[in-house]
């Protein structure tokens, strides 16, 4: 096995460094896994990850969000609790974010060149500002509103 030194592997090493410096496990682990996949016999699975990675990530994120309800750590609110203004605002915020994410998926598919800028912005937010990497879809949705696409 020989290591591939290319701009992408260097980029992944930089991400790992930023993740460690920024104390962000998500970016560190993701970049490390992708570097290992790229540099080993697992590279044959990169097209699969490219095609299905976003969907798999959304499924895993959804499982993480729903698991406290399923485990009983968080109970489902009663109907009267849904009428609380904070709960209604939370529902509206959830609807808005889901809508933005949908617009973002359309924009990312229709204008793949913009994905690079969205990823760089997300990486900066994750590595340096303590954010989490759920931003590209929402960022793409916001961008679609700003540029009138999607």
Swiss-Prot record:
UniProt membrane topology term: Multi-pass membrane protein
Keyword tags: Cell membrane, Membrane, Transmembrane, Transmembrane helix
Main localization (coarse): membrane
UniProt-annotated location(s): Cell membrane
InterPro entries membership: UPF0756_TM (IPR007382)
Any Gene Ontology CC annotation: plasma membrane
Pfam families (UniProt xref): DUF441
Membrane-spanning intervals of the chain: 12-34, 52-72, 82-102, 123-143
Recorded family membership: Belongs to the UPF0756 family.
PANTHER family per UniProt: UPF0756 MEMBRANE PROTEIN YEAL
The protein's name in its UniProt record: UPF0756 membrane protein APL_0366
